[in-house]
Amino acid sequence: MSLKAIVFDRVLGKCSVKILDQLLLPYQTQYLTINTIDDGYRSIKSMQVRGAPAIAIVGVLSTLMECQLLLQESFVKTQSFYDLTQLEKILNERLDLLLSSRPTAVNLSNAITDLRKLISNDIGKTYNSLFQYACDIIDHDYADNFTMGENGAKHLLAQLEKEAFEGDFGVLTICNTGSLATSGYGTALGVIRSLYERTKKQISGDEQPKRTKTSNAKMVRVFPLETRPYNQGSRLTAYELLHDEIPSTLITDSSISYLVSTSKIPIKAAFVGADRIVKNGDTANKIGTYQLSIVCRHFGIKFYVVAPTTTFDSNTETGDKIVVEERPPNEFRFVQGTLIDGTDPTPVLNESKTPVKAKVGITPLDMPVWNPSFDITPYTHIDGIITEKGVFAKDENGNFHLETAFQ
């Protein structure tokens, strides 16, 4: 099992980039080489790589790798569309292509805006600038994820202490927001990881410094939603939770209310990621997030969005202005996965001993379908937005003030 979504060998002038093909998980681990912007575009568009932070990183790295090829005169001679005297113009056009791969995730848009400021007709200068930016975006994302994890864990435990809650509790999450969606550790799943680290210390009897102990509450189980129709919860989040040995139970998207009402341990919070957060706090995230927020609101469960400030959109006032990507209808009509033996529940292997992929139809081919990739959760349903800069809470009038997130 591998949780390394992006492998970047950062040697100036000799960089290499590989990404984990997440369409093959959880039964097969295979890495794809990224050499050009076209490679980056295809891997993002096809969802071989997904998660707003990871999409941005792969976009940046694919641009870096294409510029690294342009340092080679032999490569330039094979490219009819590349005239190095027009490098800045051509690269901007290439970035337009990259941007079209996933329009809802703002991290990619923000990163491309930064890249446009770094490119010029000087290929050497452009490459060096892109190399430094690529290193920085990966390092900052990784560090920010740990910070968000700690911020979120401390905040929830402090809230539970205010409620005088003690004992075991569970949390909900949707889609995949962990190492596979970022440079490592994760956003919403990073908070869950940090919560469970505290639980393990309490169970083992390890003493915590008084200044960090905020509650006797213990998160003892995670309930990830399967996240139809692409099943990021069942394929990817379940994979990460098993890897980290975090107690968890996978549930169907339609069973949330029944789970909450019958669970033997109280469900105290839901942690979700974000692909775009606008100025009033409205949040675009994986389809199904909005309905999860409605369930949490009904049952009085805290609902938190976890995202780095690179996910904030300073140009959009409210969520109704967000462009929501619609995926191809056949991604809904068909289910793709690893072929399982009908008599023995193990993967069927081909001649090279790798699992066989299969696609199964689940609805009439001529049935019209609606397949939005995201929905918009209104800020009124969100109790807090957890970032690397801290936790944004609402004022007494129920409004967020996110100005510092945009600085």
Swiss-Prot record:
One of its GO terms (molecular function) is S-methyl-5-thioribose-1-phosphate isomerase activity. Its main location: cytoplasm. The keyword Calcium does not apply. The record marks C175 as: Transition state stabilizer. Transmembrane segments: none annotated. Its EC number is 5.3.1.23. One of its GO terms (biological process) is L-methionine salvage from methylthioadenosine. The keyword Isomerase applies. It is found in: Cytoplasm; Nucleus. SUPFAM superfamilies: NagB/RpiA/CoA transferase-like (SSF100950). The active site is at D275. Pathway: Amino-acid biosynthesis; L-methionine biosynthesis via salvage pathway; L-methionine from S-methyl-5-thio-alpha-D-ribose 1-phosphate: step 1/6. Keywords: Amino-acid biosynthesis, Cytoplasm, Isomerase, Methionine biosynthesis, Nucleus. Belongs to the eIF-2B alpha/beta/delta subunits family. MtnA subfamily. PANTHER family: METHYLTHIORIBOSE-1-PHOSPHATE ISOMERASE (PTHR43475:SF1). This is Methylthioribose-1-phosphate isomerase. The lineage of its organism: Eukaryota, Fungi, Dikarya, Ascomycota, Saccharomycotina. The gene is MRI1.
